[in-house]
Amino acid sequence: YFYGLSSHENVEIKLYNKANPLKPWKMMGRMHDKYLIADGKTYILGGRNTYNYFLGDFPGHKNFDRDVLVVCDEPQKDNSVNQLWNYFETIWEQEDCRYFHNSKKLADRQSVKKAVLELQEGYQQYFEVNKEKICDTDYADETFETEKITLLSNPIHTQAKEPVVWYQLGELMKNAKERVKIHTPYIICNDMMYN
């Protein structure tokens, strides 16, 4: 499916730090970010993986991930949508990011054509079932205004990283007037962090 998607003229896919058994010291440098930026004004970020177990109706265990939708009609320079875009660009341009493939000829392969058709049919089925949610949603009605959104991340290089997010959270918490509310699918705290 990645070949099918990346064969589209408007799609580029890069791999972050592709696993290389000849460089085992880099294998722990993984990227687990999940975000989608649309039109430079809206983004979704969260913890949802793109496997059926995490999406849709999967029998058995239900997994409830937290996604955040941010809508900004007129983003200013220091707005979080621009912060996220700059973060994306920094990762995209890293030496450790390489194109999934560079061959336009792949689109002519029968297996890729089949994958493209399956993706198109899957989207059409999804659209038919969810048409009302997709077309008739007033996002202004379903969101609430914030004074500020602060996006945090640990370093994005592939070497060992300092855990700077906890320090950044601590600095933000020092500025709280009444309480602190953290919305994240990722945080796992130890005893020291709870105190």
Residue ranges with predicted function:
Residues Y1-K14, K18-K34, A38-N195:
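Charged, low-complexity intrinsically disordered terminal segments
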